[in-house]
């Protein structure tokens, strides 16, 4: 297996719903680092697993859609907590739709992981293993 990954910064806002500290239930901002790691079973004819430029363009597009946005206002989070776990899921599914809408061949893709880093030492991720 081969893994290729990229990282980008992102600032989003959210508020937690439920029994949390007062500062967590009011809208507040996080400076996240989002990491996208793609795993493929074999390299293409050029010796690459995935095109880093394509990954960067797609991740940048998805990040532009949430940069500075209050996540709770997005339809995806209407019935979900705006946790970093669900933020990773949202980003992973958004990336899948971006690539699928272009007809990107997913037959070689085995998994991808989206990690959302909240600090230098804390992150949550979603691992996608189905690409249809």
Predicted features by range, described:
Residues 1-132:
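Charge-rich, low-complexity N-terminal segments
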């Amino acid at each position: 297996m081969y893994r290729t990954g990229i990282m980008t910064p992102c600032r989003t806002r959210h508020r937690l719903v439920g029994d949390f500290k007062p500062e967590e239930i009011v809208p507040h901002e996080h400076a996240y680092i989002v990491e996208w790691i793609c795993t493929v079973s074999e390299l293409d004819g050029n010796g690459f697993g995935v095109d880093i430029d394509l990954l960067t363009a797609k991740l940048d597009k998805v990040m532009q859609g949430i940069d500075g946005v209050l996540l709770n206002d997005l339809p995806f989070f209407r019935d979900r907590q705006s946790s970093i776990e669900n933020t990773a899921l949202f980003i992973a599914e958004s990336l899948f739709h971006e690539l699928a809408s272009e007809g990107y061949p997913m037959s070689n893709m085995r998994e991808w992981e989206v990690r959302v880093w909240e600090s230098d030492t804390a992150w949550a991720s979603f691992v996608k293993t189905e690409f249809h």
